Curated annotation (Swiss-Prot):
The keyword Ligase applies. Its cofactor is Mg(2+); Mn(2+). Mg(2+) 2 binds at E260, N262. Its EC number is 6.3.2.-. It comes from Chromohalobacter salexigens (strain ATCC BAA-138 / DSM 3043 / CIP 106854 / NCIMB 13768 / 1H11). One of its GO terms (molecular function) is ATP binding. Mn(2+) 1 binds at D248, E260. Belongs to the RimK family. This is Probable alpha-L-glutamate ligase. One of its GO terms (cellular component) is cytoplasm.
Amino acid sequence: MHIGILSRNRRLYSTRRLVEAAEARGHTARVVDTLRCYMNIASHRPSIHYKGEEIEPFDAIVPRIGASVTFYGCAVLRQFEMMSTYVLNDSVSITRSRDKLRSLQLLSRKGLGLPVTGFAHSPDDIPDLITMVKGAPLVIKLLEGTQGIGVVLAETNQAAESVIQAFMGMKANIMVQEYIKEAKGADVRCLVIGDKVVAAMKRQAAEGEFRSNLHRGGTASVIRITPEERSTAIRAAKAMGLRIAGVDLLRSNHGPVIMEVNSSPGLQGIETATGKDIAGQIIEYIEKNASTPRKAPPKPKG
């Protein structure tokens, strides 16, 4: 098979590992810079041009689209879909998962566990919004933030009100969530491929930090997840329509709650923590599914 990997940086760990895994299994792989792809939208024969030439056909595309280029990246991915190329995660599913508010609404409709989450526009509603999520301590999140950026822990109602007012004054879209104190600064990342959790790790926040993102100094270790956590992760990925996903859970007193469903999960932390060849399992999944007549991923409403 000839596999294309949409990535802006071929030196990134996840991109390198996918190329290595594809070549180790006898395939060819090409890293394609998403932002150098361009296309004639009105053409009756869909195609994509890359650095001055029409790009060659691929048997499969693995999208590694960063959050900052979601709009353009998904436009490129849609063009590959129009060319009947198998895509590991499709453009609709990626767009859906990148919208924090919409994704939580979809997960809620499926009856999956979530932290109490509030969303409001008017500063007049801030006191009631804080009460709605059980009061401080609470977490305030920018809807456009990634890797823990734009996430604030407010330890008092007064602090929460001040931070929310500041964000609203900047016309920033935010959501407010209850703080799951019993998680003790740790979350669980489940890596889902197809209908299986193939690996899981615990991410522990650094000393004095509540955000467990590895980019913020958190540490990762292998963990055994419960059947309920496994089921929750698989159902969350399915609700988003994702074939591969990193599902982040917190262990609350009332069971697992979903923090985020990531459509382009990094491989370095979880491969290092678990010792598993996740990249190889991704390529194996593509082999089993791209070689058969193309199947559309599940299309939940919303």
